[in-house]
Amino acid sequence: MSPSESLFQYTEKIYALSINLGLGVLGGYLQDKGYNVKMRDLNITLVNKYKDENSKKLFEIVFDINKFKNYIFTGNDIEIDSLIESFLSEYDIANEDIYGVSIGSDFSFLQIQFGFLLAKYIKIKFNKHVFIGGNNISFLYIFKDVFKEMWEIVLSEFKFIINGPGERCIDEIIQDLNNNTNSDKLSSINGIINYIDGEIISNPTMKPLIIKPDWGDMDLSYYTKCMISENDSEKAIKENLIYFYKWPDTFAGSVGQIINKYNKLRRSDVSNKLIIPYIFNYNCPYNCAFCTQSDIDRSSIIGGDPDEVIKDVIALKEKYNTNYFYFLNNAFNFSPKFVDSFCKKIIDINLEIHWSDCGRFNNLTYERLELMKKAGCVKLTFGFESGSLKIIELIDKRINLDHAERVLKWCYELGIWVDIEVIVGLPQEYDEDFNATCEFINKNKKYINYFWINEFFVVPNSLIGRYPEKYGIELIKDINNYRKLLDNNLKMFKRESDNVMTSNSKLFGFNEINRRNFDAIVSDNRKKISKLSNMQNSEFNEAAKFYTMLCEIK
């Protein structure tokens, strides 16, 4: 796993890295196939070796397009060799048969660039095949016109760049290499990206599988949360659920990150516990126009069998000695039948676990939510997006706002925390539409734990990206290019810019036909984000300030 600059940007993350589910899925699948798999997360090396500003400067070369291009083409650069060798010095990887590099999933250009450089180094140093994957590959491919120069560079050197789920693709590559299969057959494997007659073309991606993750021989101590020691104490369990489920912990200064630091530095009644990520359904039966899940190849749900999923959960609970899970499905309640069966079985066997997941308001009743609570549900995150009926209809959200309110109240009564996702800046969102969103939030503020504020950006393979005129907009595709993004990210890395990393995903702009232009939309969005931010529950900022102060006391 290539390292991300988020550890430099969000220093509290040093106190608990995020365990990568993709590595676990790969490990689980390939080990079941009989492969001896060794996995290494170079973010751990980043934590151990490169904490200060002087060492941070070593990474600035990664953003240099000329050095990047020269190294991929020639493999000759003493500075880059030195940086990579320093990263790999504590690992014995010289005698493996084949190598893989993940370039991550969070739009990090350090992670992307470093990952490709690392793959080139390994290829030259060990003279072995290297495959490259990670969700950032899908991001780069979706915006392949923006990143055409990068694709031309890396596809000139690497045969096995994988788009989409990689586990079966890797298995096929290895089998075909062992059988001395010709290059034409190798290049036709599903998921492989090729450069053909000046075009960047991905073969159809593999369908995802429900796989029990297994992180093999990785040192998982870096991913643990510093929890209050429980000893069957209901009070301690309640505290831990507040700290690590109720309180947000994914952004700079978030109270969840700070409390983890405080527990580690200041408390003695603590123990380290993993919260295991696990996914058991893919794709989405709905067709929200803004979402990448509205792509034509993602409408068919791939869902796990309740008995098999529970079997996986039990195995993960026992192997990693934890009752805590983050389920990472698009919608836990994609199927009422699955929900009822899964929850009843957990209750019947008295399986003690705590979990959170995403959900849809649709098909949820008080009784079903009560069942979920008894089965260990702690928090649900719902895609609310907008309180405007006009916007809901435009994006084909298919939610009933009255029912959504009832679900929020039921969750509150049952003790399930609810986060909601809000999107600002959707096409044709005017003052009256935004005000409807604010009114819904204010009306239901008592029942909403936290709301995630997302600024809309166009995804090319979504319905809005494919048919912009239907949504009253025209796309602007030239506001960014690869070189400009590298320059902007270097400035951010050096703290010369206050852009957040997720701005890397906002690569297309748009004008509304006969209404607002792009600049006006961006200006409106800033005001909306500011207003919504001021509506958040004050509990989180107050707790963050309090525990930050306690951490700083000598």
Where are these regions (language model features)?
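A structural motif corresponding to the C-terminal lobe/cap of the Radical SAM core domain
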Residues: 8-11, 158, 303, 336, ...
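Hydrophobic/aromatic residues located in beta-strands of well-ordered beta-sheets
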Residues: 37, 130, 189-190, 325, ...
